[in-house]
Amino acid sequence: MSLSRLYSKKTQSSYNATAPLDRDPPEYPGDAFKKSRNKPTLTRPKSNLSLDDARCMIKGQIQNGSVDIELAKHYLILVLEQITEDNSDDWTSFGVQILSRTERGRPLCMVNIQLDDKDKTFDSQVKDSTATVEDDLWMTTYLLAIYRIGRATNKNYQTQLIDELNKLLATFPGDYVPMVQALQAFDSWPNDPNYCKLVACVDMFFSRFKKSKWAILRFGTISSRYRDCAALTALNHFSRLLGVDLVDALEWSFVGRVSDEIEQMLKPDQELDKVDSYTPYMIDLGISKASPYSTVRNPAWHLFCHTVGSLMMSRRSINARHLEAPDQSNILSNAELIVFVFETRIKWLKNFRKLDSVDASDQLDQVAPVVLGTKDLPNTTNADDWFSWMKLNNFELPDECGRYVSKLAKKLKDSREGSVGQFVYLRLGD
């Protein structure tokens, strides 16, 4: 593609109008598997430490308030290798066979495991010899929950998760130790690549084998699914906000930058509609280093979707983090129109009637619609109707729209600092 050139009238010189890229290009999961049809690789600590000894050391370290992450990974792998589940179906993703129908399911079946280069010796001074196999469920849940709690950026939410975890651990067999706040592991463990791969394996496996007693481990791993994919998951959110299917919802994208990002997310052959795909775990499994589905990659779509949601009083949208986006004024105007249309154009169906009776309202279905002039607002929620009207009226929002949306935006006055809700209030309601 040829680049536009900038011409200086003053110096009569021309220049390439280029700016440095501020981030690496996105990496799609499908592209990674085109290069190699192999499972992702998990590196485990190289140690002969038995499960019995590792169990006692882990319990002792949990009681002591400081757990060696290498020991934790070694112990988790030893426990997970003991778990098997009945399986009767082939499991494939991007042409990679994860399980065949003749194999029993194992939590680490989606990765190839290799040993670390160096032997690992663990400090055995801190141990609890009372640890038994009964402790495995609560200890694995505890160790995996460090991922979810550590990734929580809001301290109040982090405290809430710890409270929920401790209530859960109290229901398990064994002599559990409650988690406390301010563990050093919260900061470091979610940044360890192989710990994150373990977390992803557990969540991916028990997302498929939901009836297993070990599926409770997903309490701590659930946030690995669709990590750095918030813009992608917002597609369903947007569709639900409007109450229409996704195709009809996306027809309302009238801003070029928003539409570009939607196309980026909907690139084909990425298994977006396959629930047991590698795609939701592409970040933690190391398949992609730069998600094409993150809010950072799709700031225009993020603002568009959550401006609509904020004006519709969706708590998820109101609290969404505000990111600087290109063409914000056009995005806000597009969102204003959508909210005005979908909140003032009611679409109902009379779904029931008395048996053997006739509804008079059914006869109205045969009445031809009135053709509107350029000043008459469409009575539909059809995107093409409204785009045509806007085009005929020089893309100026109706006065009724501005007044209606302003009232809604004023309700967002107390939104969280740095949120989309606060941004919408300051731009449209203040």
Swiss-Prot record:
One of its GO terms (cellular component) is helical viral capsid. Its main location: virion. Residues 1-17, 39-48 have a biased composition (Polar residues). It holds the Pfam family Rhabdo_ncap. The keyword Ribonucleoprotein applies. Keywords: Capsid protein, Helical capsid protein, Host cytoplasm, Ribonucleoprotein, RNA-binding, Viral nucleoprotein, Viral RNA replication, Virion. GO terms for molecular function: RNA binding. InterPro entries: Rhabdo_ncapsid (IPR000448), Rhabdovirus_ncapsid_C (IPR023331), Rhabdovirus_ncapsid_N (IPR023330), Rhabdovirus_nucleoprotein-like (IPR035961). Encapsidates the genome, protecting it from nucleases. The encapsidated genomic RNA is termed the NC and serves as template for transcription and replication. Nucleocapsid assembly is concomitant with replication, therefore viral replication depends on the intracellular concentration of free N, termed N(0). All replicative products are resistant to nucleases. This is Nucleoprotein.
